[in-house]
């Protein structure tokens, strides 16, 4: 429900949509960072399209610590499918009293998202957009060839092995030894300077005293600052339609109202491997041998050096093993509701919400050989499909009243029926493909 802020006694935080828009972020959760006391928002990866981890008032469980998300009355919806320009406000319920109505699902807090609603009056059209470029403020320093040689020999001596004679192993060793040739900086080679990011949102609102509407259309695009030449990228298209209609009205209040909130989003994401230390392309670039050139004399990716036969080319491995993939996501979130107010301050509301997701993933790994232990003898094609849906039916009745001017009371009773986890998952792969 809705309460005046001065009457709320629970621990809540509200962030207005206008404040979120000003920060020019791809995700609304990114804009909430540093604006919500007691809420810790982190991102485990900076790859475009990656989500956020949210904990409210500290980590209190060994299981999932994420809060319950409710978008326009639909529980479990993904906030990353929303464009920040479509958000009217975000409320974070941090204590048990504020989130009690949601039961055990709200054990880690609740994030309530309200999208922009219609307003009576002439049609109003607004556009919000930005275009920018992204760069790394400071790259992680890596060892150059001279420093790498020194550390390698220190390690061999500690293991009781003879030091490498780099003058006989490395052509033009003198240029490395005197520091004029720094070798290959693999992390810098992955850097995508001036990676573009943009967002465009068009909103239309208007209506009459009986019916109001709000329409939103948006496009978001972001490229990764690391991953060249794979070029990680995230694109999202959204469409939103919110309407509300008054069927019967008294002089002082609306007796019968109904409305709907509909949001559709489509996104595409491609990227590199960002898993653990063994499946992480950036980690591979940090550890790679700077003596290894990126390309050989034929312009192909260079094979491992004879004296370092397991030291693969990290750029080639990133491109061949992890760089040819595409994830597509379709999401529909819909909610219809009716509100009855037979007498003033007695509100009876029934709402039905539906969420549907349809996701696909495709990847291709070609034949390659980069080192004695890093190779793929057969190409591989993988395809996955995931479809899921869920619904929620909620009914509430509330009554507000005052005793004198200083005592405000609100009583509410409600029930909900929810079904989630409906769907199918299909995965298939093949080697030696003919297409």
Residue ranges and their predicted role:
Residues 346:
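An active-site-proximal structural segment forming one wall of the substrate-binding cleft
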Residues 120-183, 227-234, 238, 242-331, ...:
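Surface-exposed loop/interface segments of Gram-negative outer-membrane beta-barrel transport/assembly proteins
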Residues 1-249, 254-258, 333, 427:
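Short, small/polar-rich motifs associated with maturation and membrane association
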